[in-house]
Design a protein with these regions (language model features):
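Cleft-lining beta-strand/loop regions that shape enzyme active-site pockets
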Residues: 1-162, 346, 350
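Mixed-charge, polar/low-complexity N-terminal
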Residues: 3-4, 61, 67, 87-88, ...
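Generic structural signal for residues positioned in beta-strands
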Residues: 23, 85, 111, 172-176, ...
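A general structural signal for short secondary-structure boundary/capping elements
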Residues: 104-108, 161-165, 219-227
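Polar, glycine-rich mid-to-C-terminal structural blocks
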Residues: 123, 135, 140-210
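Conserved functional hotspot residues or short segments at active or partner-binding sites
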Residues: 183-381
Length: 384
């Protein structure tokens, strides 16, 4: 169950009260034509549980999602839009197929943020890009996603001399057969999906993107898909993004956790840029001591920062709860943990970028509330 979607609720301090921000982490778009679990069904189940907890905003965490089934990506995007295009697929013969979500049902119609990184690739870029094109979600995270906008297929090779015949292995070649394009017509290849609000990360300096590969196909564009969204569908306003970005940048310049993050990123960046290595034994020993002192200092700082983490409560899929209960029964443990599961606990690992994304969502919810109060019509009272 480690690859299944999971969720949590974070209590974000907002003035005199707390906001409940839901987070759904999805590491792959799993699913098949069989009876096994499907990413879309699991995310929909978690969204229902988050709504039952009166969550005010949802963050879809795709930072570790390298892709998966295209059909699941399309269906999952459909949980947040009523109808409309999700992706365009261009084949080697030049034919373009437009993939739509036709299901009008919405699993979540409130504020939505998609949290991404340079490791968010392929199908996760389709979901992030489509929701951005629909003005349905704000993208937060690394400056861009991975940039994998192509589809490969394994082609069996019939060789005149099959050197692997004795081992039973067959030769094959992986051939690029299709290319992905967003509803706007822009390809996700090389450039990926650009975040509306970005944060410092060492991923910027690592050769982990599609653009770092040899002979990667270029980014291009095709005609956009024209579509109309229902007037009642929740969408963000451009002014919202600018305001949220300014507030986030202000925090990134002032808060201790970003001082820590920038210090960490700069250290790794400088290490990667070093082009010489001393052969003097004493110099190497001195450098090792220096590195260890830096590491110890950063660990101490991180432990202090971790005390500021928001309270968190995990939300499990039904199948996960059932398996956890069975495991406790086997170990002879108390299975009545209803009180424990309702408690908000300090997370075991302080996630600075998720922490800031929760703040961005809290700011956004506050802006929406203020706007609704401003536009709310006064009630008319009958005169006596």
């Amino acid at each position: 169950t480690s690859d299944l979607a999971s969720a949590s609720i974070h209590k974000v301090n907002f003035g005199k009260f707390d906001r409940k921000i839901g987070v759904i982490e999805l590491r792959k778009f799993y699913g098949s034509s069989g009876s096994g679990p499907k990413a879309t069904d699991d995310v929909e189940e978690l969204l229902e549980k988050l709504k039952a907890e009166e969550t005010e905003g949802v963050i879809l965490d795709l930072r570790r999602n390298g892709g998966g089934y295209l059909a699941e990506a399309i269906n999952l995007a459909g949980l947040f839009i009523s109808r409309g295009p999700v992706v365009q697929v261009k084949s080697t013969d030049g034919k373009i197929r437009k993939k739509f979500d036709f299901n009008p049902k919405l699993a979540w119609d409130g504020p939505l943020i998609v949290l991404v990184s340079r490791y968010s690739a392929s199908a996760s870029e389709i979901v992030a890009g489509a929701l951005q094109n629909h003005k349905r979600a704000i993208i937060v995270g690394d400056k861009t996603t991975h940039g994998k906008g192509t589809v490969q297929s394994l082609i069996q090779m019939n060789l005149p001399f099959n050197f692997n015949a004795s081992s039973g292995k067959k030769s094959a070649a992986k051939i690029t057969i299709q290319k992905y394009y967003l509803p706007s017509g822009k390809s996700t290849q090389i450039q990926g999906v650009e975040s509306d609000i970005s944060m410092p990360t060492i991923n910027t300096y690592l050769p982990i993107g599609e653009s770092d590969l040899d002979n990667a196909l270029p980014c291009d564009s095709i005609a956009p898909v024209n579509f109309r969204r229902p007037a009642s569908e929740f969408v963000y306003e451009l002014d919202d993004i600018q305001h949220l970005k300014e507030k986030s940048l202000e925090r990134q310049q002032l808060l201790p956790e970003f001082v820590y993050l920038n210090k960490d990123v700069n250290w790794y960046k400088n290490k990667r840029e070093e082009t010489t290595l001393s052969l003097n034994l004493q110099n190497r020993r001195d450098q090792k001591i220096k590195n260890q002192k830096f590491s110890d200092s950063m660990s101490d700082d991180f432990e202090i920062l971790s005390k500021n983490a928001f309270g968190r409560k995990d939300i499990n899929l039904n199948i996960v709860d059932i398996q956890n209960t069975k495991s406790r029964e086997v170990r002879g443990e108390d299975i009545d943990d209803s009180n424990a599961t309702n408690l908000y606990k300090s997370p075991s690992n302080f996630d600075i970028r998720l922490h800031e994304t929760c703040r961005v969502m809290s700011d956004w919810v506050g802006m929406i509330e203020s706007r609704n109060l401003t536009h709310k019509k006064p009630e008319l009272k009958d005169e006596i």
